[in-house]
């Protein structure tokens, strides 16, 4: 439901309350509460941020793959698998944001899951510090080029000597994950992220 429709419903609810039409007012109140919860959910996390932008050669990565208890999205730089209970009819399918089905084969994302996490060192990420660094990048960009920009591909965040794209790292942090696991000996391997709801990976930037 669009925000304009929600605003109209709110006005109707206020009118019905004044007219003491409590039954209808309560019904509209429930609709507004449900829509508010849905909007909060959508604001919290959007898995389609992780899909590949339009690419005629890799259309299978432009949707979300439903695989058992996970739904998975990747753009080949970062990957996120969200745990939950998903509709049975979507199992094994790749679904675009508009609900249409993509005909294609999704990569074997489970092959990225390390069999042994021992070589991976945890790094706690300070989201506020990352946000401050990104804001500094934006100010520097504006000072140099005379115009502001939301993102630039050259912006990097250094974590224990390993570089990551600022944009992709920030998207990973949108899941609420705050710890990055980096392989101690092979730092160009994908770094691993996980919590109770998500499992994911992000590729470092090759120097």
Please report, for each region that a protein language model flagged, where it lies by residue.
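C-terminal functional regions that serve as terminal interaction/effector modules
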Residues: 75-79, 83-207
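Intrinsically disordered, low-complexity linker/loop segments enriched in Gly/Pro
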Residues: 17-82
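Residues that form generic nucleotide/phosphate-binding pockets
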Residues: 15, 50-51, 133, 172
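Short intrinsically disordered terminal tails
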Residues: 1-3, 39, 207
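Short amphipathic alpha-helical heptad-repeat segments
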Residues: 1-17
């Amino acid at each position: 439901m669009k925000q304009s429709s929600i605003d109209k419903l709110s006005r109707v609810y206020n009118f019905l309350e004044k007219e003491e039409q409590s039954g209808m007012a309560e019904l509209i109140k429930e609709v507004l509460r449900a829509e508010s919860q849905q909007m909060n959910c959508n604001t919290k996390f959007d898995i389609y941020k992780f899909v590949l932008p339009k690419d005629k050669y890799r259309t299978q990565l432009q949707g979300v793959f439903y695989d058992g208890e996970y739904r998975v999205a990747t753009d080949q730089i970062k990957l996120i698998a969200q745990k939950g209970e998903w509709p049975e009819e979507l199992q094994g399918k790749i679904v675009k944001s508009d609900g249409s089905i993509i005909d294609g084969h999704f990569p074997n994302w489970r092959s990225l899951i390390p069999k042994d996490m021992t070589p991976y060192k945890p790094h706690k990420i300070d989201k506020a510090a990352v946000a401050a660094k990104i804001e500094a990048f934006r100010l520097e960009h504006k000072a140099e080029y005379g115009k502001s920009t939301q993102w630039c591909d050259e912006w990097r965040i250094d974590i224990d000597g390993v570089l990551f794209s600022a944009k992709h790292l920030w998207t990973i942090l949108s899941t609420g994950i705050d710890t990055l696991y980096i392989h101690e000996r092979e730092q160009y391997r994908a770094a691993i992220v996980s919590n109770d709801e998500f499992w994911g990976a992000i590729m470092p930037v090759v120097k």
